[in-house]
Amino acid sequence: MTTLQEHTTPNGDILLYSGAPNFKMLDTLAQGAGDVWHSSFEQGLKNTFPQLMYQTAVHWWYLNDFNDVDTAISWRINPEAFVVRKSVWELVGGFDAIYDSKLMSAFAFGINLLRNNGGVPLYVKGLFSDASLISSHIPKLDQYKFFRKHFKATYRPVYRFCN
């Protein structure tokens, strides 16, 4: 279970966060686009979980992370260092508890937010400047659980051993 702290911006927006974000930058970000903000590229998560390319349309442009950008749409959320609007967290239901890995739960949250709920998860360079690198390992069983839950029923027999 992820324990999140609460921050209220000067405009009254209620945000939930994990880690130690730059609050001045965060107050500015909350006035604009985005529902989730993170700095996961610097934390070792850039282009993690490339196996997703085998289960989604190749034209789905959010599959790859871009180089040399300060802000970009990215569903690769670090569960130890991110910020989310409280209303969005409650609407989507937070991280899915079916996964053993917190990282897979965070990725599934980001993909679900972007793909199914019209939300915008944003990578923001420098929002979490003191966050350290994390392991990008996702257990195979969690990968299978993800594919089983999020893709066509015709693929499910392949993943039937995941329960």
Stretch-by-stretch model annotation:
Residues 98-101, 107-130, 135, 139, ...:
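Catalytic donor-sugar/metal-binding loop of nucleotide-sugar-dependent glycosyltransferases
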Residues 82, 106-107:
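Generic non-transmembrane alpha-helix signal with a bias for helix starts/N-cap capping motifs
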Residues 76-80, 84, 90, 94-101, ...:
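Conserved nucleotide-sugar donor-binding catalytic segment
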Residues 32-40, 54-67, 89-98:
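Short charge-dense sequence patches
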Residues 59-84:
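A recurrent flexible, glycine/aromatic-enriched loop bordering the glycosyltransferase active site
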Residues 4-54, 119:
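Conserved donor NDP-sugar-binding/catalytic core segment of glycosyltransferases
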Residues 2-10, 55-68, 135-163:
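Non-catalytic membrane-proximal stalk/linker segments that position and tether the catalytic domains
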